[in-house]
Curated annotation (Swiss-Prot):
PROSITE patterns recorded: YCGL
HAMAP family (alphabetical): UPF0745
Organism annotation: Ectopseudomonas mendocina (strain ymp) (Pseudomonas mendocina)
Domain YcgL: 3-87
PANTHER family documented for this protein: PROTEIN YCGL
SUPFAM superfamilies referenced in this protein's UniProt entry, alphabetically: YcgL-like
InterPro entries associated with the record: YcgL-like_sf, YcgL_dom
Pfam families: YcgL
Protein name: YcgL domain-containing protein Pmen_1774
Amino acid sequence: MKRICSIYKSPRKNEMYLYVLKADALTRVPEGLLGIFGPPAHAFDLVLSPERQLAREDIATVLENLDKQGYHLQMPPPEEDYIQHLPDELLCRNDPV
């Protein structure tokens, strides 16, 4: 079943997103979560269906959370995903001899 979803970006946490059903807007999101999330900034709307793939979230989990609790919170990736690992030869290239 297809769902029209609004996706909001957190101003406090980089890469944290809140998925809600467009018809419900933010009415089903707990106040405590909104307090931690910060004032939601609308990013975009999206049609979700079981066939659709999302970049970092499992579509079945997102749809289930939207049906059961009215929202889905996408957490930022773990910090090690941000770190680019460089070879040792590049790390010590400018070291004094």
